[in-house]
Amino acid sequence: MVVLSKIFSCALFLSLGSAAAIDIRQTSSINNAFKSHGKKYFGTCGDQNTLSIPQNSAIIKADFGALTPENSMKWDATEPSRGKFNFAGADHLVNYAKQNGKLVRGHTLVWYSQLPAWVKAISDKQTLTSVLKNHITTVMSRYKGQVYAWDVVNEIFEENGSLRNSVFYRVLGEDFVRIAFETARAVDPHAKLYINDYNLDSANYGKTQAMVKHVKKWLAAGIPIDGIGSQSHLSQALSALASTGVSEIAITELDIKGANPSEYVAVTKACLEVKKCIGITVWGVSDKNSWRKDNSPLLFDRNYNPKPAYNAIIAAL
């Protein structure tokens, strides 16, 4: 996750501080308006605790086209003990999405954080390879055909562009990426397979350059990476990611400190300008339930009312 600060200075064509800043939510759902430009979805995240809130659920049904599990598909939730899986939370989200016609983005299969201690303690290559393959196979098999895309590996780069010193890299080296993606492709050949990371906002940033270089190399080696998920919000950076040869990219886990309308509009327009950018996921619905609630970063306030940023996006679309 990354929180965007005040980067953009462009002015909106309507004055959000005036009477013109009316609630135009009823005019069009943000997902429908975004899809009218040829995009696939404008989504959000959730889990059973937030999906069960009536106001929150009503907004998801009306305004968003895709759901990403906030925590329920992470390793500590799905396999807290070796070989003992718990799918209660993930099942709830996937069933909710099916019942309400929403796409699902699976998040996430391989991540250094929210990882059980028993996985972190593995030091043997053969054991970790077996554990990694079994985890990916078991989780993906349960939802085969029900998940549009999976974040197969998540946040594997350091800020300087080196590969993060996770248990996966320490024990398996760079090969853990190949193992993860090849296993995922074998389980569900039709799901889109993503590498996901944050702080890829500048095409010249070391982390962005490392992502581009490595994905090009991995694709050339036949590793089945379909997409890059990023919090990038400038079209130049998104274009750099698209140049790797992946079939699609997506803006993921987006929230903006203070929910500045011009910044949210800039993010939306950046995706519209890059053909391979197929969707945007805002990391939550209401500020009330945001993991950064003190920053008021989302499109709906603590009373579940649309904020100026929501109306600004609709107006821009």
UniProtKB/Swiss-Prot annotation:
Disulfide bonds join C271-C277. It is found in: Secreted. It is an enzyme of class 3 (hydrolase). It catalyses: Endohydrolysis of (1->4)-beta-D-xylosidic linkages in xylans. Its EC number is 3.2.1.8. Induction: Expressed in presence of xylan and repressed by glucose. InterPro entries: GH10 (IPR044846), GH10_dom (IPR001000), Glycoside_hydrolase_SF (IPR017853). GO terms for molecular function: endo-1,4-beta-xylanase activity. Residues 47-316 form the GH10 domain. GO terms for cellular component: extracellular region. One of its GO terms (biological process) is xylan catabolic process. SMART domains: Glyco_10. It comes from the Eukaryota. Residues 1-21 form the signal peptide. The active site is at E155 (proton donor), E253 (nucleophile). Keywords: Carbohydrate metabolism, Disulfide bond, Glycosidase, Hydrolase, Polysaccharide degradation, Secreted, Signal, Xylan degradation. Pathway: Glycan degradation; xylan degradation. Endo-1,4-beta-xylanase involved in the hydrolysis of xylan, a major structural heterogeneous polysaccharide found in plant biomass representing the second most abundant polysaccharide in the biosphere, after cellulose. Belongs to the glycosyl hydrolase 10 (cellulase F) family. This is Probable endo-1,4-beta-xylanase C. The gene is xlnC.
